[in-house]
Amino acid sequence: AVASAFIDKKIITNDIMYSNYICHVAWFSSEHYSEEKVIKIITQYNNLKITEDNYMSDNFSNTYFSLDDCRKIGFIRQDIEDKFNLGYINARERALLITSLLYAMDKIANTCGHYDAYRQGVEFEKHLELYVPQPEPDVNENNVCYNMDTNELAPEIEADLIYIDPPYNSRQYCDAYHLLENVARWEKPEVFGVARKMDRTALKSDYCTQKATVAFENLIDSIHAKYILLSYNNMANKGNDRSNAKILSKKGKVKVFSEDYKAFSTGKSDIQANQERLFLCICNNERKEVIPSALNYTGGKYKLLSQILPLFPKDADQVV
């Protein structure tokens, strides 16, 4: 994670996916935890032989995982929740155990890199084995982890540097990683279809739709920071219609850094000239508060203000 490069600083993390949020808590929360306890529990989990069925085996056996591994995953995930509810483990220890389980699942999953489909008729050669997470021992005590819509959170925080890594095409993350999200949340929802997906309506991102440009503009406009660093994969000529540099330039001076990048593909596409791009915006220090008129009429010029404001008198404190 990018946040690991700033481990001695105050870090604020956010992700709408609970499966990512819980990993952030594991790695970056400052809550004290017992490493000895976590090691003991993970050792017990690795030695388990489960023969009773549960939510995982009832819904996912012999799809992404074998029947035995599904039984084990389901038992472990429920046991983590039981231990937490009984007060035997704290929130950080719970996060570490769930993170260990999610990483172990993803390492052996019968997929082609995501959970939109599984390979049928294969032998399950790899089996579940949990490892002990090793977070940095001296994280900043003021770290905060959020599980929110970024556009709702951004106006509420201030930072020196804000790093943004939004979706860059129409592929919803919650579709590609639904199973990990399901296990992380552990609400045991009904699943459907060949891919055994849960209802993901609440997790859908505007950044994967035609609303992406407006969502991105609103996000950048609401950010209070000295620097904004945006990671964006241009997917050659696909999906890069957000005019990132233009939108960021309304906030300050923009520099663009590019590096060739090999995109993941399921074989249905051959994307060439793919690049990972970093947009660094050095934000203007001054803040201009612009309040749109309550009278929403056809001739309104609110969207043109970024072009008009530079022409206004510099000594004007309030313009109506």
What are these regions (language model features)?
Residues 1-3, 30, 266-269, 283-320:
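S-adenosyl-L-methionine
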Residues 10-12, 16-137, 174-209, 214:
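Class I S-adenosyl-L-methionine-dependent methyltransferase module
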Residues 205-255, 259:
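Conserved Class I SAM-dependent methyltransferase catalytic core
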Residues 147-152:
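Conserved SAM/SAH-binding loop
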Residues 10, 227, 318:
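Residues at the starts of beta-strands that form the adenosine-phosphate
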Residues 1-5, 13-18, 102, 155-176, ...:
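Conserved proline-anchored active-site loop of SAM-dependent methyltransferases
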